[in-house]
């Protein structure tokens, strides 16, 4: 119920179009999954590491410049969606990209840094013009005098970016990017949909490292998932030392993933409502469960089956990792100096 009212509130704040970034997440999976397959089959740099967490990217550029070739070249979902808005969507609507102002509402403070990167521009035009956090959005709604609880429930704008899948939904929890990618990689390797759609091996919201070895049509894919930079350091040092056994690694800067991002509302731990149940359930657990529940409720749960994603490639991009896709949806990284290694506290 909150989502519909949030959409209504944003329209009353002055936004002319409101889209769900889950569409961008589906697009990211198409590009990232294809990139991974290319590296696996063509002798590319492995392990490949996810690139959608800007806090992690910042850490890598300062502390692990020698490992930057391991990072996926894919932009993060909201940057990809911004690039599509200012290219395909602008073209479809006869609007000059320079006249479009894209604002991303994010759970992450580091997204403000990400959108300023020169590598996140196309022909000098930024994919995203401004980033506000979920906490800042709540403050804007309150200060504008909008009576949130009395708002009607409204839906996202549909046109060319209204559809999204369960795979896009689970991006927000640690392990979600990995699972979403594996659903599509499985299909591309086998030509069939996985009967049991979930990959329980990579699920969990806790900070730390999880690993799994998956046999996909005779191809063994070793994967690791971690959130929090302390855990990431362990995996990165293994790569440096030449002892890493993985093909694909997901790294999230925030323990638990984006659900625990630095821009999210402050919430204390709470007990489950059932008074007979004394199990402590934290807000991270509740948010993770909410995303997995929404994934299960989706009719379509694999990014490659999103009809609007299919249409976008047919009419505009050509195919994943095409020349046009690389121009719009991929980025690059550069080693930087001036920062000592970041000390983090995982909660």
Spans of model-derived segments:
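Iron-sulfur-associated redox domains of electron-transfer enzymes in respiratory
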Residues: 1-347
């Amino acid at each position: 119920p909150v989502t519909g009212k949030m959409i209504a509130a944003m329209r009353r704040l002055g936004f002319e179009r409101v889209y769900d970034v889950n569409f961008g997440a589906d697009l990211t999976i198409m590009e990232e999954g294809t990139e991974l397959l290319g590296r696996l089959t063509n002798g590319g740099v492995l392990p490949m590491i996810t690139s959608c967490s800007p806090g992690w990217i910042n850490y890598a550029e300062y502390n692990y410049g020698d490992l930057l070739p391991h990072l996926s070249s894919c932009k993060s979902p909201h940057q990809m969606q911004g690039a599509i808005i200012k290219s395909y969507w602008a073209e479809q609507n006869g609007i000059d990209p320079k006249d479009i102002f894209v604002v991303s509402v994010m759970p992450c403070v580091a997204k403000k840094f990400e959108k300023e990167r020169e590598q996140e521009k196309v022909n000098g035009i930024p994919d995203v013009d401004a980033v506000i956090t979920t906490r800042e959005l709540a403050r804007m709604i309150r200060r504008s005098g909008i009576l949130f609880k009395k708002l009607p429930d409204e839906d996202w704008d549909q046109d060319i970016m209204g559809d999204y899948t369960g795979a896009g939904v689970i991006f927000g929890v640690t392990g979600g990017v990995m699972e979403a990618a594996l659903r599509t990689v499985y299909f591309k390797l086998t030509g069939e949909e996985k009967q049991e759609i979930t990959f329980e091996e990579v699920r969990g919201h806790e900070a730390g490292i999880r690993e799994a070895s998956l046999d996909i049509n005779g191809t063994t894919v070793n994967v690791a998932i971690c959130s929090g930079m302390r855990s990431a350091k362990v995996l990165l040092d293994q790569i440096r030392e030449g002892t890493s056994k993985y093909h694909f690694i997901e790294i999230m800067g925030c323990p638990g993933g984006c659900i625990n991002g630095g821009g999210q509302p402050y919430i204390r731990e709470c007990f489950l409502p059932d008074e007979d149940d004394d199990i402590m359930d934290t807000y991270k657990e509740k948010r993770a469960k909410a995303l997995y529940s929404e994934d299960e409720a989706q009719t379509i749960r694999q990014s490659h089956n999103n009809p609007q994603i299919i249409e976008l490639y047919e009419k505009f991009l050509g195919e994943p990792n095409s020349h046009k896709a690389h121009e719009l949806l991929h980025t690059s990284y550069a080693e930087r100096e001036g920062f000592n290694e970041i000390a983090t506290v995982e909660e």
